[in-house]
């Protein structure tokens, strides 16, 4: 790979140089800070932001630098004491980059592979450390966010305070999760200070959006606080017949009768309209993506409605014990029509034969997690003991139908083609419950912290599938149970360096059965060994982390060709080994920066015929990124101006598990510029203009995953006018 390595070297050098420079600059800043007793007009004061929520995912951050989170241990634990690789996307990063999707939100986090399916506004599909976490790795406020088939909850970035990322197997606290780790999305919560914001946006493809965010005390007498966040969007996309419309509203209330008691209610409703198909036609002769839209603008509506309401309750019983309970009910309904062109017509090669379908899916879930935390000493040992029990109940129902569609005319590929009504062919109903109980002790002695935890889960899954044409019913019932654990040791020096080592496991129950053996699938299991170091520079708001990891996953599910059809088989084993480094800083001089590099080697140890020993498709060895944002001094000629820019490198990878062809490497650039009108006159205080661009140079190359090829999302430019008062 000489060419790819050559292309990668400049960005790797940039990331490593940025990391080294951060240490030097931050150290110099710290030395200057020690010598200064007051700030001058050129400095920018950083505010420590606490995203409250108890075990729901509290994040404490200063600018771009996450300091502590409840994601790593379900207790508010400093990153330096967490014996596992952990990162955060802070509130300030969200403001500076103005992401429009969850994938854009996570684009600069280490080891996270976004864009494996190219342009596709239907789903937020992504990988970490080589493992898909779309269905199993997304949590909301430390509670599992279930997903099934096409029923995947959409996550609005404007409704988030931040994201905490815990990489590697994490079932010791969270139960059914995958090998890659979990992404905990922290919902905006009520603030005690008054917050008022309105914003209008206009961007590429006639994207119109208005949004608002209000928070503060309900009145001056009662300890009750509210927050109301919402947006309305009408937008086209780069594909004809694929809109990106959304209506979103999220109310929240907090009641704090005393310092030891808090109840927060979190709600949300959204309606999103996009396309049932968003892919490009793949030419069977070459196996590569063309520029022809594979769908049908006249039969391509996908409407998703989702709602959730839940609470977080915390009560301090005494100086030792704190009780917490988090719960949520969520529902999702998606109705979609789709059309897909798959190959040339036998009689007329200018036509492409197509198939069409329709589906109606409904997902309802209830999740509750009850915890008791105790802090006490035994001799010289300090303990933070956590005991908990959680329960998840979900029901998934799907109606699916397949039919015929008029062929696609390649001479006029965007012309709509009428499709006759399609009847549903099958109905699937799945009921699943999971019960887990866990225990964890964080034991501190001098500079040492030992974290030991274990969890036992029981899972029951019942699946009924009905052929509506014959009214025949197939029922599958299975029960799984599994123990998961984690042990980690951290040593924290008095100058901010914290090396650690850990071992953790995860399990994931699988629905269905092996058609070769007629036996239910076993749970997918994984284990990880990790060693790393974290460095919080003294007297400087800079955090640098690095980690080496080895993950083994067994009993994975794969599709294997048997005759003329594909069946699911379970005889797989994957191994992921790699290295990650990340640096985040927000300095007093107005500069904030995040940089990361990840090397990941993911191989198929056991799998379908022709794949053993190969690399997993669309899993690049190298991923690197750098993002910087600078606010010019208030007393200089550029007062009020902020500029930002970033680069995201994705190394080459294979386009299928057979490793017969490759995806090329690529670098995508992003940019931002903002202006605070208060620099002109104080009467304009609160009025700000910001313009953000992603994929600035409109690089739209093919990216292939599991043998099917897509295209990168093209350039988008969005201007925002925001007013706070």
Residue spans for each PLM region:
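Conserved C-terminal beta-signal and adjacent last beta-strands/turns
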Residues: 6, 384-385, 529, 617-725
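Outer-membrane beta-barrel translocator/receptor signature
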Residues: 158-161, 167, 172-251, 257-261, ...
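Face-selective signature of the C-terminal outer-membrane beta-barrel domain
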Residues: 309-332, 355-466
């Amino acid at each position: 790979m000489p060419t790819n390595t050559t292309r990668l070297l400049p960005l790797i050098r940039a990331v490593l140089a940025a990391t080294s420079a951060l240490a030097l600059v931050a150290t110099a800043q710290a030395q200057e800070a020690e010598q200064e007793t007051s700030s001058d007009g050129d400095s920018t004061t950083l505010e420590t932001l606490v995203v409250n929520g108890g075990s729901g995912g509290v994040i404490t951050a200063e600018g771009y630098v996450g300091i502590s989170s409840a994601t790593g241990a379900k207790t508010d634990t400093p990153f330096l004491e967490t014996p596992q690789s952990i990162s955060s996307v802070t509130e300030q990063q969200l403001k500076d980059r103005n992401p429009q999707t969850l994938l854009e939100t996570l684009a600069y986090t280490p080891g996270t592979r976004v864009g494996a399916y190219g342009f596709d506004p239907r789903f937020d599909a992504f990988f970490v450390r080589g493992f898909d976490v779309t269905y199993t790795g997304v949590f909301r406020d430390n509670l599992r966010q279930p997903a099934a088939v096409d029923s995947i909850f959409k996550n609005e970035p404007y409704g988030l305070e931040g994201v905490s990322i815990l990489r590697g197997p994490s079932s010791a606290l969270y139960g059914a999760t995958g090998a890659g780790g979990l992404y905990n999305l922290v919902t905006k919560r009520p603030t005690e200070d008054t917050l008022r914001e309105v914003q209008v946006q206009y961007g590429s493809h006639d994207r119109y959006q208005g949004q608002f965010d209000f928070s503060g005390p309900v009145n001056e007498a009662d300890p009750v606080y509210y927050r109301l966040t919402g947006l309305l969007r009408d937008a086209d996309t780069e594909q004809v017949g694929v809109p990106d419309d959304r209506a979103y509203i999220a109310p929240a209330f907090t009641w704090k009768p005393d310092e030891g008691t808090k109840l927060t209610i979190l709600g949300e409703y959204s309606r999103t309209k996009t396309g049932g198909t968003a892919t490009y036609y793949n030419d069977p002769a070459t196996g590569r993506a063309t520029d022809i839209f594979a769908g049908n603008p006249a039969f391509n509506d996908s409407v998703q409605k989702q709602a959730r309401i839940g609470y977080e309750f915390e009560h301090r019983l005494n100086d030792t014990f704190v009780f917490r309970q988090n719960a949520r009910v969520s529902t999702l309904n998606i109705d979609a029509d789709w059309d897909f062109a798959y190959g040339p017509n036998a009689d007329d090669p200018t036509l492409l034969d197509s198939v069409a379908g329709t589906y109606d899916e409904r997902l309802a879930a209830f999740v509750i997690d009850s915890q008791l935390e105790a802090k006490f000493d035994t001799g010289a040992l300090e303990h933070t003991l956590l005991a908990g029990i959680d329960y998840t109940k979900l029901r998934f129902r799907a109606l699916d139908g397949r039919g015929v569609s008029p062929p696609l005319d390649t001479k006029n590929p965007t012309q709509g083609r009428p499709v006759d009504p399609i009847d549903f062919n099958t109905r699937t109903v799945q009921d699943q419950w999971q019960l887990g109980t866990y225990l964890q002790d964080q034991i501190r002695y001098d500079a040492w912290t030992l974290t030991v935890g274990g969890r036992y889960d029981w899972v029951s899954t019942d699946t009924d599938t009905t052929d509506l044409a014959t009214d025949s019913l197939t029922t599958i019932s299975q029960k799984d149970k599994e123990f998961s654990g984690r042990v980690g040791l951290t040593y924290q020096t008095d100058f901010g360096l914290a090396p650690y080592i850990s071992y953790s496991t995860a399990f994931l129950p699988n629905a269905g059965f092996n058609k070769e053996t007629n036996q239910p699938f076993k749970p997918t299991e994984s284990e990880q060994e990790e060693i790393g170091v974290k460095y919080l520079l003294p007297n400087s708001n800079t955090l640098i982390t690095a980690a080496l990891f080895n993950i083994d996953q067994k009993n994975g599910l794969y599709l294997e060709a048997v005759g003329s059809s594909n069946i699911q088989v379970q005889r797989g084993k994957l191994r992921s080994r790699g290295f990650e480094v990340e640096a985040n800083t927000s300095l007093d001089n107005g500069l904030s920066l995040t940089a990361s590099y990840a090397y990941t080697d993911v191989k198929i140890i056991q799998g379908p015929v022709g794949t053993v020993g190969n690399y997993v498709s669309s899993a690049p060895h190298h991923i690197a990124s750098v993002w910087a944002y600078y606010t010019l001094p208030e007393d200089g000629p550029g007062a009020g101006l902020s500029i930002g820019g970033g680069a995201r490198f994705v190394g080459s990878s294979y386009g299928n598990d057979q490793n017969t062809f490759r995806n090329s490497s690529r670098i995508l650039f992003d940019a931002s510029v903002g202006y605070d009108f208060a620099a002109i006159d104080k009467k304009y205080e609160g009025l700000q203009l910001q313009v953000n661009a992603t994929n600035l140079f409109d690089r739209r190359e093919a990216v292939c995953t599991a043998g099917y090829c897509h295209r990168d999302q093209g350039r988008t430019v969005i201007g925002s006018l925001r007013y706070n008062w």
